[in-house]
Amino acid sequence: MGSYSDNTPAIHDLAQKMISNSMIDTSLYSKYNVKRGLRDLDGKGVLTGLTDISTIIQNKEVDGKLVPCDGELYYRGYNVNDIVGGILEDDRFGFEEVVYLLLFGEMPNVAQLKDFKDLLVKYRTLPQNFVRDVILKAPSEDMMNSIARSVLTLFCYDDNPNDTSVDNVLRQCIQLISVFPMLSVYGYHAYNHYLRDKSLYIHRAEPTMSTAEVILSLLRPDRKYTPLEAKVLDMALILHMEHGGGNNSTFTTHVVTSSGTDTYSATAAALASLKGPKHGGANVKVFYMFEDIKKHIKDWKDDEEIEDYLEKILEKQTFDRMGLIYGMGHAVYTISDPRQIILKGAVQKLAKAEGYDEDFELYERVERLAPQVIGKKRKIYKGVASNVDFYSGLLYSMLDIPCELYTPMFATARIAGWSAHRLEEIVNVGKIIRPAYMSISTMKDYTPLEKR
């Protein structure tokens, strides 16, 4: 009797049949002006909706023409550079404050922020025995699947899971934002213990801790962390919280929400999207790529040797043979990703404190050389610059966050943006999202079964 997961010869034969009858002539996309990926060749997205949650600027008008510019990102009209700068100047944690901003559209005052933090702490608890019965009893080797399963199971513990009124959805969203750190870290501990035979420890979240502190304290055996570590993680969370309505996972949130489904299902769908290596899964790909580079390059300061190896990566001769230099390029930004610029400064500071100077310098060299290599080897329609994923893997590794949690860290931040967009979709009572697909099928006469 074969395993549940076996791909048998029969399945292979059926797969080949499916492929032969499913291929579409790529020239037809141009013929019918299909916007593959809902984007033009220059990367400009097809306008499918309106949002007041965030603003992304990648070009500006000069002499009546749009020209690429350094990227800018605004949360509810506030420049992210200013938000992060203000938080750094005050030497405080800011994730919870920015969650408030994204959800409610305005900056909280001191009293409002305190009340909101208290609300997050109140909801930072899972149902009785949930960790034992749901997370520990069915560990997964993929943390994104573990989180999605936990989110869907929370539906069963909610007395009003299908109520899509604004009040109820807001309550559900705040609860999910509060428990995502625990779903992520506890899921990892279950995997680490039951599938890797490591020690198991489950810490409780302290009510006085920020979200970044909760993550580090739950993850580490001794619960210890430095203020710098927690502040840098807090910044990374802020920079990953939101990025417009058109990114794959947030657009998924809009699409699924427009059907009228519940919050848990919409969030699970967004998680499934973010898991993909072309979206949130790219950060761990960057880290693995650099681990491969370190193994194969003798002199980390030799530009020529680095260029040669990057060319091999592009030509599918090494690493994962996908032909991609991960962390380079973005669907929207052309010249620079503002999140990457902010994060890079924090990563450099942490690298110096933790003794990762040589690693950081290697990342900088690849960041400088990769656009040149891509420009020589590929036909590109817009500029190529490093994105926020480029340095995030190095950051997480310096924080001793395991690779299995890289994308869940992204999700722990982005749940705030997903929640804001879900609420925006509900408040504005939009139509169900249903774009057009053109059929290119050839009409055929039906043949009775015995005559085929």
Model regions and ranges:
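Non-transmembrane, aqueous-exposed alpha-helical and coiled segments at domain scale
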Residues: 1-452
